[in-house]
């Protein structure tokens, strides 16, 4: 097993409920600090990679956010390489989407505790909790980022470029990223599932059963569908807001399930 994926976490309970969500959690977790000061949005894939590296360097390897950040960094580096190699039919679309997408993560990562987007709260609250494996943190971060942030990023990108989700090669280019994510997801699952102790440890077996219920590609397929819905709702402020509220709540629920300590 990857040493970074086998490290255990410690936690200092504060015995405080999240404001406005009494009874949802028995306690809140004392979380390591993120980036020390708010940073401006990045404007290129190269800047995004550098920012991801900075965030990772400032976190303990066992921090739940670091577990996700490592996986995201690897995927972003691969996407950047493919953009440079002309792998995508519309590199401008993919570059803008990649930058818009990653900035949503950066905003969540540096948000004050009371301002963390709902979809990201499970990971941010439980990133130092005991009994949760690194694979759970990595997939919970992917859940928040893909299920909630990706539809928003697609619509924002299309708006900025004066196009629509169904135009040109957008969907085909979007789907080309799936191969990279397949490799990243397979790698993290294999590093966990190939552990010799897995067959003997009921805890690890339970975690394995839990994380196999969620896959990145299924989440991305749904994210594209939700982007199409958001695109149609872009001129209806009320309907769009209600849809986004429901999306955030559903994403948060899935995140809490993925982060179940077993």
Model-predicted regions and their roles:
Residues 18-99, 103, 108:
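Leu/Val/Ala/Ile-rich N-terminal alpha-helices, chiefly Sec-type signal peptides and the beginnings
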Residues 210-262:
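A cross-kingdom marker for long, charged
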Residues 10, 14-16:
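Extended, well-folded catalytic/binding cores that form a central cleft or groove in large enzyme
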Residues 151-207:
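Short helix-loop boundary/capping segments
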Residues 73-165:
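Long acidic/polar interaction regions in large eukaryotic complex-forming proteins
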Residues 4-7:
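Short, intrinsically disordered low-complexity segments enriched in Ser/Thr with adjacent Pro
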């Amino acid at each position: 097993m990857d040493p970074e994926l086998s490290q255990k976490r410690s936690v200092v309970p504060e015995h405080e409920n999240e404001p406005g969500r009494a009874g949802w959690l028995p306690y809140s977790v004392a979380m390591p600090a993120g980036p020390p000061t708010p940073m401006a949005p990045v404007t290129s894939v190269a800047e995004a990679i550098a920012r991801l590296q900075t965030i990772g360097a400032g976190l303990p390897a066992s921090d739940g956010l670091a577990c996700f950040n490592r996986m995201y960094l690897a995927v972003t580096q691969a996407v950047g390489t493919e953009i440079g190699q002309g792998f995508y039919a519309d590199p401008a679309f993919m570059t803008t989407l990649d930058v818009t997408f990653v900035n949503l993560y950066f905003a969540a990562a540096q948000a004050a505790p009371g301002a963390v987007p709902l979809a990201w709260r499970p990971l941010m609250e439980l990133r130092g909790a005991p009994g949760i494996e690194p694979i759970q943190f990595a997939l919970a971060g992917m859940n928040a980022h893909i299920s909630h942030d990706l539809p928003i990023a697609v619509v924002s990108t299309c708006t900025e470029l004066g196009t629509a989700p169904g135009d040109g090669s957008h969907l085909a280019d979007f789907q080309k990223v799936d191969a990279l994510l397949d490799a990243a997801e397979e790698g993290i699952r294999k590093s966990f599932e190939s552990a010799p102790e897995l067959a003997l440890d009921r805890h690890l077996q339970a975690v394995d059963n839990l994380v196999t219920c969620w896959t990145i590609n299924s989440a991305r397929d749904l994210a594209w569908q939700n982007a199409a819905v958001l695109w149609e709702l872009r001129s209806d402020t009320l309907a769009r807001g209600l849809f986004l509220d429901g999306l955030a709540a559903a994403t948060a629920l899935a995140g809490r399930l993925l982060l179940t300590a077993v």
